[in-house]
Curated annotation (Swiss-Prot):
Bilayer-spanning residue ranges: none
Domain of life assignment: Bacteria
General function of this protein: Binds 16S rRNA, required for the assembly of 30S particles and may also be responsible for determining the conformation of the 16S rRNA at the A site.
Subunit note: Part of the 30S ribosomal subunit. Contacts proteins S3 and S10.
The protein, known as: Small ribosomal subunit protein uS14
GO molecular function: rRNA binding; structural constituent of ribosome
UniProt GO BP: translation
Pfam families (alphabetical): Ribosomal_S14
Length: 101
């Protein structure tokens, strides 16, 4: 299991990213706008750099809901491959069964 501090850090990053999402998108549109002047672009770049690092959504890590494991994460289930397999073997995930051919 992942440390509680690692899980809490990811939750904090998600909150910060959602808080600054609109501001980041507005600055990104100015930066990528071909009609914007160089001064406007440069100001937008500087403002974007002033935002907290955790405001970037790429700093978030997909983690298993149950264990907090960061690797082997399956987006469809929101869990790690290990927990998906355990729950599938117990029949706790409807419609999921072991493959056999």
């Amino acid at each position: 299991m992942a440390k509680q501090s690692m899980k809490a850090r990811d939750v904090k990053r998600a909150k910060i990213a959602s808080k600054y999402a609109e501001k980041r998108n507005a600055l990104k549109t100015v930066i990528n706008d071909p009609k914007a002047s160089d001064e406007e672009r440069w100001e937008a770049v500087l403002k974007l750099q002033q935002l907290p690092r955790d405001a970037s959504p790429t700093r978030q890590r997909n983690r298993c809901r149950i264990t907090g494991r960061p690797h082997g994460f399956l987006r469809k289930f929101g869990m790690s491959r290990i927990k998906v397999r355990e729950m599938a073997m117990r029949g706790e995930i409807p419609g999921l069964k072991k493959a056999s051919w």
